[in-house]
């Protein structure tokens, strides 16, 4: 029987909720593009519950223990004396989330002699050193598309919040003020602005579709160009490189994976290409941006605003400059972990575990690494010959021999 080590974020400070704001969730049959939702044989939770925190356990305990497996759940993931470090030694399966990542570095993977599956409850497995997973024949899987729309909605919200100067205006109201001039002296209409996305995959394309009704000019850059029919439908302008797109955009949203080509792609030099007073929204990965360069750009006025929910490391230290830099709209990493999204990624996690334990194939779209090589979504997402090296440096990918 297997030991499953699950790393989840802490419960609410007031305790695990007994009631919720809504009684149910809207139902959808499939994702845009036709991919079906997760199809586990059963679930042991009510959709709409808090599943991503420690007490929620992704709704997995009953299923795992009834089949003879052991489940260890913790939020204590960092440092040599953490629960995660201690329990990893004999774990067969590690489950983590992008929002509260348990970094599977080469050293940790080498230490985990029994590890067979690294499962991301969500999208994005850059917290796993994929080369080490390849070398050790560890399967890496994630619940593709489970929260893509959740993130896309968050991006649109953040764009509007920055451009309309919503957060400082709300703060005036909260503090009892009525300082209209202070609110509107940094506020603009989104209409007719040029908005571009770096990457137009599931999330990037969903962002473009949601922005189209705002009568903006839409731009994108991506290795994989969208079909001509989609470009015409949304009146998209494609740019061969990021550097070509930056100068024409008032707003740039980052929706690409983290790998060697994209790490710190927003830096002092590339920020010089942006329009003065541009906005950046980053819900992809914190290391896409040079931390201090972003803060300097806001302080100098090069950028009019920066918003996102991704940091490095996560959780961010209390003195991280993105917490206090001017005109920021930062939140903890929450865009993809709404209660709606949790129901989907918990069900997808259950589906992957069922397939893994029963010896059935895991969906190709869920796979990142399998059989000592990049597989499925992983083979498509990462540049040929390269991928991310867990939480730190990237390594050249080579197939295990």
Swiss-Prot record:
Site, as annotated: Important for catalytic activity: 285, 333
GO molecular function: formate dehydrogenase (NAD+) activity; NAD binding; oxidoreductase activity, acting on the CH-OH group of donors, NAD or NADP as acceptor
Enzyme class label: oxidoreductase
Gene3D superfamilies: NAD(P)-binding Rossmann-like Domain (3.40.50.720)
Binding-site positions, NAD(+): 148, 202-203, 222, 257-261, 283, 309, 333-336, 381
Sequence positions that bind substrate: 123, 147
GO annotation terms (biological process): formate catabolic process
Effect of residue 256 to S/M: High resistance to inactivation by Hg(2+), Increased stability at 25 degrees Celsius and decreased thermostability at 45 degrees Celsius
SUPFAM superfamilies assigned to the protein according to its UniProt record, in alphabetical order: Formate/glycerate dehydrogenase catalytic domain-like (SSF52283), NAD(P)-binding Rossmann-fold domains (SSF51735)
Keywords recorded for this protein, A-Z: Cytoplasm, NAD, Oxidoreductase
InterPro entries recorded: D-isomer_2_OHA_DH_cat_dom, D-isomer_DH_CS, D-isomer_DH_CS1, D-isomer_DH_NAD-bd, FDH_NAD-dep, NAD(P)-bd_dom_sf
Superkingdom of source: Bacteria
CC annotations in GO: cytoplasm
Subunit structure: Homodimer.
HAMAP family membership: Formate_dehydrogenase
Family: Belongs to the D-isomer specific 2-hydroxyacid dehydrogenase family. FDH subfamily.
Purpose of the protein: Catalyzes the NAD(+)-dependent oxidation of formate to carbon dioxide. Formate oxidation is the final step in the methanol oxidation pathway in methylotrophic microorganisms. Has a role in the detoxification of exogenous formate in non-methylotrophic organisms.
Name of this protein: Formate dehydrogenase
Source organism per UniProt: Pseudomonas sp. (strain 101)
Organism classification: Bacteria, Pseudomonadati, Pseudomonadota
